[in-house]
């Protein structure tokens, strides 16, 4: 049939491309058979648009290029919604075992982000106050000073919510809000993160307007130079309302965090590039000092970028 012929042509094209690419990297008669018969590990790193993950995985399987000693790495976003994410994961699982699949969020590789687990679970100083008994709210900010640059076509189908919030910012939120894992092993950390995500209060028609803000950057000045609006960027549909800025108020419905809002914000073409977490503590229940002494709430600031570090802001005598 024409469908089978098309699949065959796609398969052959993919196989030829893979072989050619490998020979380009290693000129000495590299063949696909070398991959399968050699003992060394092979990693398929899919640095491609997510809509190609399914096709690539299927072609690898159809060409017998999936074997015990290989791994596949996929980057975010894995799909554009729940259905496409399930479709991609099902296609990956059809060829690879779960322990062969690596779903990568490169933001978790940042030293300051990795340090969140150590900060929380290797120190006792914060644990007693790490809950709604002492914390008023938590802010997570990832601001970028650049526009979409040469990613207009990709970004126009994605937006800030899918590009940043559903991976980077939610990963940070999970590390901040999760309970202590049984161990530092990936499965244990994953299980505690999942509990946080399941506890997030869903948006409703009644609260979506007050708990979220979306926007696009306009014409302006960036780094001292004129910069065009998002709708005038190359590859962007001028009729689209894809957001380049999003701010959310999230709530976690569990004993530790009930009543503590989490404010997430991210955007492009912001004033400066910075990433930080601000833990704002509650004010003292009663001010015993003079009325002129304006006591500010304590703050723990975890700086991810540009200068990694920790600031603890307290009230002291002037």
For the regions a protein language model found, what residue spans apply to each?
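Secretory/organelle targeting and membrane-embedding segments
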Residues: 1-74, 78-318
């Amino acid at each position: 049939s024409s469908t089978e012929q098309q699949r065959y042509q796609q398969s052959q094209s993919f196989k030829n491309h893979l072989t050619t690419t490998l020979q380009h990297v290693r000129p000495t008669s590299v063949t696909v058979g070398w991959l399968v018969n050699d003992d060394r590990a092979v990693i398929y790193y899919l640095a491609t648009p997510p809509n190609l993950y399914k096709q690539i995985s299927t072609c690898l399987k159809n060409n017998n290029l999936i074997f015990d000693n290989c791994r596949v790495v996929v980057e975010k976003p894995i799909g554009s919604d729940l259905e496409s994410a399930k479709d991609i994961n099902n296609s990956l699982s059809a060829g690879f075992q779960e322990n062969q699949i690596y779903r990568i969020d490169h933001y978790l590789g940042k030293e300051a982000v990795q340090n969140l687990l150590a900060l929380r679970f290797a120190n006792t100083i914060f644990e007693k106050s790490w809950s709604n008994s002492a914390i008023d709210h938590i802010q997570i900010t990832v601001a970028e000073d650049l526009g979409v640059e040469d990613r207009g076509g990709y970004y126009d189908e994605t937006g800030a919510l899918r590009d940043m919030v559903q991976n980077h910012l939610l990963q940070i939120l999970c590390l901040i809000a999760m309970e202590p894992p049984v161990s530092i092993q990936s499965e244990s950390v994953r299980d505690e993160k999942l509990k946080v995500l399941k506890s997030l209060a869903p948006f409703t028609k009644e609260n979506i307007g007050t708990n979220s803000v979306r926007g696009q950057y306009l014409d302006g000045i960036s780094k001292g130079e004129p910069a065009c609006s998002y709708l005038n960027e190359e590859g962007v549909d001028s009729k689209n309302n894809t957001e380049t800025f999003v701010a959310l108020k999230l709530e976690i419905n569990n004993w530790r965090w009930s009543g503590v809002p989490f404010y997430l914000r991210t955007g492009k073409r912001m004033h400066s590039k910075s990433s930080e977490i601000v833990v704002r503590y509650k004010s003292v229940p009663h001010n015993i000092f003079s009325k002129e002494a304006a006591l500010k709430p304590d703050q723990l600031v975890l700086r991810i970028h540009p200068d990694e570090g920790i600031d603890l802001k307290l009230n002291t005598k002037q």
